[in-house]
Amino acid sequence: AGLKGTLTDSAKSGTFVMDTLSEGDKITIAGKEYKIGSSTTDATNLIDKADKELTAAGAGSTKDVEIDGKKYTLTFKTGGNTIADAEGNAVADLNTLKGKVKEGSSVGYDGKTLTVMNDKLGGGTDGKTADGIDDDDSSIITAARAKDLIKAELTAANNIGTVDEKATVEDGVDADGKTTFEIHKGYATVANTLSFNLHVGADADMTNKINVEIDSMDSASLGIKGLSIMDDSGNAATYAVDAISDAISKVSSQRSSLGAVQNRL
């Protein structure tokens, strides 16, 4: 599914493990890059962090915080740190600085930038229920929304070629800085491999035989039965390309195997 993580496969199940997403992280899902948005509290906590680290650093120290593209410099001062913008205009205190953070604001400190989400509209029946997608920028989403999108992509990727039973993916579980998705594979019933021996020697020696195995080459066996390239996102066509490529490789491998047998006759 083009996701960054580790996929572990077995015959009937699998797991996909990735780093747990946090505010400010970026992730690409189905070819689109998303950024994990934050709450106002998360963003103002970043400013508090700068102030605390400045106080711990002591005399002669400064820390830079950026709010909506504007830089503010915190300078250590016994009895209370001072704050000024890039033009030298003083900011009264830390609470005044934090008051500049609104919905849609970006706050940067120490290489990390958080974007405060504006998420009032959404998928509720009243049209005003938060849906985990920023109302002004659809590329900014919550970590929970990102997990839903990842689950959907893993489900789509694992259902290519399934006919009799569809694959399912459980909700991602966070633990120890990792998020794990459990995958239950689907399947398509296919014909058994045809296997027989050709006797090529002049005597009854059992070594004078060539074993021939022919796999079924129908659409279900090739994993392309019911394959669709139609959806709103274009992802179905993307996964179809891989499925068709795998099918071509399987047919080519079977032809190669039969050609090798023919050359021995």
Regions of interest found by a model, annotated:
Residues 1-264:
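Polar, low-complexity tracts enriched in small residues
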